[in-house]
Amino acid sequence: MTIELQEVSARELAKKYFRGGEKSLAELKARIACGLAAREIDCETQARVFEEALEYVILGGRINATAGVEGVNTTMVNCFVQPIADSVFDPVDGVPGIMEAARQAAQTMRLGGGVGYDFSPIRPKGAWIAKTKSLASGPISYMEIFNSMCSTVISAGARRGAQMGILRCDHPDIEDFIVAKRVDDANMPWDRRPFRNFNLSVGVTDALMQAVEVDGEFELAHVAEPGPDIKAQGAYQREDGKWVYRKVRARDLYDKIIRATYDRAEPGVLFLDRINRDNNLRYIETIAATNPYACGLPAESGMENPL
């Protein structure tokens, strides 16, 4: 069955994906098929196989934009997650520090990839920094660096870069993160709005949802030692080594997430424990973040959105 393109679909197809004088969907599919088959032993036969398959599937945007385009050094992968350590410059256990992570993310976006980050490892605002005898500014302040970087870097194909910022629900700065994109003036110009180059999501754990269900307290904790003022307010160290900065009523925290989402459509939520239970590679990895593009998980009723 052949489905005719709607006018808006044809216009967007031409704007985003046509290359080298292409004028039709058939020409686009032929170019993609040849590009994907280029390294096969029998590339002509494989190209025909790919072209036939393209009658039934829609590939990712980066493949549509770059496959078969000569002289273009870009990625054909849409989705990346950039690790970040709790360090400004130095790597920690092989994970790059904040500035190096920003450099790597800039390169990824320049080549066409969308990038997600878990900012939870970064110590909270008010945490103690022993090397400089000072207090940390928190992950939200460092997110400004990534936001500005994304504004500057034009992604492959001259499109704006895409970023997803994630913070765990038990991070001590989570309440500030929830309202980080709040704008009180509806007339504020778009280019002046906070974190306009980010989608934001809260990493929600089973522990939070269970505390919400029983109307219990929920601990906001981090491995970083808090500063003197936070200690004076009652912060304490748990048996697992993490510091509990404070406790909140779970339903109040969850309500803040829901109200912010209702008012501004952000932040979203990632059900981290559910995602990792459904991850086929859970025995060798833990998923802490996603990139900006939503995905689906197969379920009996069809594709189910875990986000």
Specify the residue positions occupied by each region the protein language model found:
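Extended catalytic cores of very large enzyme megasubunits
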Residues: 1-307
